[in-house]
Amino acid sequence: MDVNPTLLFLKVPVQNAISTTFPYTGDPPYSHGTGTGYTMDTVNRTHQYSEKGKWTTNTETGAPQLNPIDGPLPEDNEPSGYAQTDCVLEAMAFLENSHPGIFENSCLETMEIVQQTRVDKLTQGRQTYDWTLNRNQPAATALANTIEIFRSNGLTANESGRLIDFLKDVMESMDKEEMEITTHFHRKRRVRDNMTKKMVTQRTIGKKKQRLNKKSYLIRALTLNTMTKDAERGKLKRRAIATPGMQIRGFVYFVETLARSICEKLEQSGLPVGGNEKKAKLANVVRKMMTNSQDTELSFTITGDNTKWNENQNPRMFLAMITYITRNQPEWFRNVLSIAPIMFSNKMARLGKGYMFESKSMKLRTQIPAEMLANIDLKYFNELTKKKIEKIRPLLIDGTASLSPGMMMGMFNMLSTVLGVSILNLGQKRYTKTTYWWDGLQSSDDFALIVNAPNHEGIQAGVDRFYRTCKLVGINMSKKKSYINRTGTFEFTSFFYRYGFVANFSMELPSFGVSGINESADMSIGVTVIKNNMINNDLGPATAQMALQLFIKDYRYTYRCHRGDTQIQTRRSFELKKLWEQTRSKAGLLVSDGGPNLYNIRNLHIPEVCLKWELMDEDYQGRLCNPLNPFVSHKEIESVNNAVVMPAHGPAKSMEYDAVATTHSWIPKRNRSILNTSQRGILEDEQMYQKCCNLFEKFFPSSSYRRPVGISSMVEAMVSRARIDARIDFESGRIKKEEFAEIMKICSTIEELRRQK
C-alpha cells in the first residue's frame, strides 16, 4: 500500500517537524595539507577591512601595524573595522547605567579569582603553540617547557604556583636582552639494520641550546599559531583558527574571567550558560518583548548574522572597554587586565607549514616553508596565490605576519559578547527617545534582534538605527544574511524558536551509537546519550526504547558479543558460548560477555555492572572486578568520567557518564611506531610529566586536599604528607614499627638528595 508522506504531518504542529529536515548525514569535511593559504586570507582580509587606518611600526619588533581605530565613518554598507573609541565608551557607560554596580561587582569577583588561580589552569586546553619548539604541543607540555626555560633564565616568581606570579615572569621575560632556550633538532643518519643487514635512515632528535635576542623572543611571545578548522559543515571553503602561546594565555584567561562575570549578570547574553538554562534565559527576553508589544505595537525579530565578526573587532577597542570597566580599581589589577589586549594589538600570525610543490615529470616533492615566502620567486605560484603573497609580503617577519587589527577566532568570546550586549542595551525607550525600541540576544558573534514599533516604518527605522550604531563599534550586521520575521519565529545559536524553543532532536543524531573507547565506557555513554535526550530533547518513550534496541544491536556487532545462545558466528562466539554454558545465572552476564540486555527506559541511569551485580555468579563477580587481572592495563576510574560527544552542529560537547572500573575498562596501548620518530623525546617528557602528576595525586587524593597554597615544591609537599600519614597509621596500629621506620628513612633520603642537587 502506498502511503502519502504528507499525511504523516497532518496532525503535527509544524515546529515539531523540524527533526525531519536533518541535512547532516555522513562525515563532516576535514582539511588536509597546509593551512598557510587560509591564514594568508585571514590576514589580508583583516587588513582590507581596516585599510583606511594609520600605519605605524612597532619599535621593538619592527613589525608594520595598521590602526583603524577612530578611522573614517562608514559611507556604505561594506564591512569595516573603524570602531570609534568614544562610542564604545559611551555604550559601556549606558550599560553600567542600566545595571548599576555591574562592573564594580564583577571586578571584585575577578580580583579574588586572580589571586587564587593556580598556574595549572593553563594545562587545560588542547593544542597550544609552544614557542620554545616553534610548533604545537599539548597544553601541559607547552607550559612545562615554558616554565623550565623561565627558570633556567633566572625567572622564578612562578615557583609559588600562582598564575599571577607566572605572569610576572612573562612580563619580566619581555624586558630581557636575551633568552636562552632548549630546542629540538632532527638528525638523519644512515645505519645498517642488524636484522635485515640493509641500510636504513635513522631519525633521531637532539636537544640544543639556542639564544634568542629580544626581538626574536618578542616575536615568538606574540605569535599565534594557525591551523585549519576541521569538521565544519555547510561551508565550501575551510578557514583558519589560531592557538596562542603560553605568554598570552594567562592574560586572556583573566580578561575572559572578568567578561564572563559580566555576561552572567546580563539577561541578553547567551554566554556563559548553555542548554536548558540558556533556553530559559532567552525565552524570558522574547516573552518580555511580546508582552510589551500589546495590541498597539508590531514586533519583529531579526535572525542576525554578522560579517566577519572577529576580523572587524579590534584589540585596541577591548583595551578601551577594560580601561573603562576597571576605572575605579587598584592599579595592579588594571595593569594585569590591559596586557592581553595590548599583546593582541601587537600579535603575529604564524603562517603554518608553507606550501608543498610536486613535479609530476620528475616525481619530486618539496616543501616551501612559510619563512621562505618573503623572498621566493613568485613564478612558481598560480595567480591566486601570487596575489595573496604579494599582498602579505610587507607584513612578514621570520615566517610570521604582523596582524594588529582583528581578533582571530574564539579568543575573546565573552568580552566581545559584552560589546554586543551593550548595543542591544541601547534599544530601551529611555535611550532611543522615540516610538521604536529594541532588545535581543547575543552570544559571541551570533545575535537575534527584536524590534517593537507602532508601524512598519518604525520597525524599519529601528533596524536602521541598530545597524548604524553597530557600525560605530566595528560590528557589521550582514544585510544579505540576516532575515526578519514576525516575533515568535527565529533562530539563535542553532536553537529554533517558534512560540518557545523547539527541540531539534535530529541535531543530536551523530552522538548516538558506539563511541569506540572500550566496552565499559561505550555501554555507559550509549545509554547516557539516550537518557539525556529524553530529558532535554523531547525524545519520546517509544522512540527512546527503539533507540536503545538499535544501540544494543550496534554494540553487539561492534564488539562481536552476541548473546551466548545466538546462532551468529563471529571470532568471539566460541569463547562466549563456553562462558554462557558455564554460567548459572545467565542474566548476570554483561552484554559485552554475551549476556542479555536488561536496560529499558526506566533504568538508564544505572551502570550495567550495578544493574546486574546481584544476578552475577560469584566467580564471575570476582573475575569482572579484579584489579589484579594481569591482562588489563588499569586506569583508576573516578566515579564520573567525561566523554566528548559530537552533535551535528556546533562544538563538540563534553558529557558526563558513570564509570565503574571493571576488566572491560581497558585502555588500548599507544602505537609503537611513534617511538622511532622525532617525537620520542617529547613523548618521554610527556610521560614523565604524567607520572609526576599521578604520583602527586596518590599522596593528595582529590577528596582530601585543597590545592596546597604556599611555596613548597611538589616533592616537599609529598614528603611532609607521607610523614604525617605514616605517623597516623603507626599510632593507630595500621602499620608496624619497622614499616614506619623505613618510611621515615626514605623521606630523609629524598630530602638529602634534594639538598645535594
Curated annotation (Swiss-Prot):
Its EC number is 2.7.7.48. InterPro entries: RNA-dir_pol_NSvirus, RNA_pol_PB1_influenza. This is RNA-directed RNA polymerase catalytic subunit. It comes from Influenza A virus (strain A/Goose/Guangxi/345/2005 H5N1 genotype G). Residues 55-64 have a biased composition (Polar residues). Pfam families: Flu_PB1 (PF00602). Belongs to the influenza viruses polymerase PB1 family. One of its GO terms (cellular component) is host cell cytoplasm. One of its GO terms (biological process) is symbiont-mediated suppression of host mRNA transcription via inhibition of RNA polymerase II activity. A motif (Nuclear localization signal) lies at residues 187-195, 203-216. Signal peptide: none annotated. It catalyses: RNA(n) + a ribonucleoside 5'-triphosphate = RNA(n+1) + diphosphate. RNA-dependent RNA polymerase which is responsible for replication and transcription of virus RNA segments. The transcription of viral mRNAs occurs by a unique mechanism called cap-snatching. 5' methylated caps of cellular mRNAs are cleaved after 10-13 nucleotides by PA. In turn, these short capped RNAs are used as primers by PB1 for transcription of viral mRNAs. During virus replication, PB1 initiates RNA synthesis and copy vRNA into complementary RNA (cRNA) which in turn serves as a template for the production of more vRNAs. One of its GO terms (molecular function) is RNA-directed RNA polymerase activity. Residues 249-256 are annotated as: Promoter-binding site. It comes from the Viruses.
